[in-house]
């Protein structure tokens, strides 16, 4: 890195980091054949923490700070810093991917990258959610009655046969802070504001509020539930080009 001072008022530093961590601790979920199971009252998927994998973290760090005002009684200092971070999984045991909830550890991808079901939209003829079909699960989808073909393209109404895709990373493109320190004699006032730009998050609270559950259960719901499908729109047919509403609510 490089650091310095200009005009006895402005301080700056620029740095680059590239850190590789080995034998990281990951939670590995065992398959059903190893005794893993699901209980509605308590999720008892058999897992084990293992020292596996190599991860790279690299990026730039920039820091600026300077005295805007500097006198016997008054001092006003402003500061700014920014950091970029690129995270990548470099090595996994046997090169095998590891699913972890809505994310997946995979060589060449970030450990914070989302790996989710690809939602296509709402079928305006039925009100059901449609997902891109995993070609390997077509027979299973057909047997379960979840296969839907619309204008020559096959979809599924169940995530069990849906195709998962990379959907961006939870890491911001850049993050940092702004700071202000104002001093008058022996009194001082400091303010620190943080920021982050980019990155995707999964709003689990919103997802929960959009789940109506059973009719007998009492729970708080989000007002967007009122936008749910409410019947076949006028003029809609099975072959309408706009049969799938990508912004619809099932």
Which residues does each predicted region cover?
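Outer-membrane beta-barrel transmembrane strands
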Residues: 1-6, 16, 55-57, 168-184, ...
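Extracellular/periplasmic, surface-exposed regions of secreted and cell-surface proteins
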Residues: 1-114
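Transmembrane beta-strands of outer-membrane beta-barrel proteins
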Residues: 10-12, 76-78, 178, 184, ...
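Short acidic-hydrophobic sequence patches enriched in Asp/Glu that either
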Residues: 44, 56, 197, 213, ...
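Glycine-rich phosphate/pyrophosphate-binding loops
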Residues: 184-204
């Amino acid at each position: 890195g490089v650091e310095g001072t200009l005009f006895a008022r402005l301080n700056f530093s620029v740095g680059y980091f590239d850190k590789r961590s080995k034998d990281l601790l990951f939670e590995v979920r065992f398959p059903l054949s190893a005794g893993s199971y699901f209980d509605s009252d308590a999720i008892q998927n058999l897992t084990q923490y293992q020292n596996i994998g190599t991860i790279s973290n690299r990026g730039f760090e920039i820091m600026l700070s300077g005295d805007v005002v500097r006198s016997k009684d008054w001092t006003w200092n402003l500061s700014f810093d920014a950091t970029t971070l690129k995270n990548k999984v470099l090595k996994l045991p046997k090169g095998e991917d590891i699913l972890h909830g809505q994310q997946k550890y995979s060589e060449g991808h970030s450990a914070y990258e989302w790996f989710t079901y690809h939602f296509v939209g709402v079928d305006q003829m039925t009100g059901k959610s449609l997902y891109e079909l995993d070609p390997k699960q077509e027979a299973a989808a057909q047997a379960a009655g979840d296969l839907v073909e619309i204008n020559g393209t096959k979809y599924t109404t169940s995530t069990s046969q849906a195709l998962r895709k990379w959907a961006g990373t939870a890491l911001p493109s850049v993050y940092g802070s702004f700071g202000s320190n104002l001093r008058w004699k022996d009194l001082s006032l400091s303010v620190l504001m943080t920021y982050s730009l980019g990155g995707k998050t999964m709003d689990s609270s919103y997802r929960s509020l959009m789940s109506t559950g059973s009719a007998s259960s009492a729970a708080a719901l989000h007002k967007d539930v009122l936008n749910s499908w409410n019947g076949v729109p006028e003029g809609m047919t099975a072959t309408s080009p706009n049969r799938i509403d990508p912004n619809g609510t099932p």
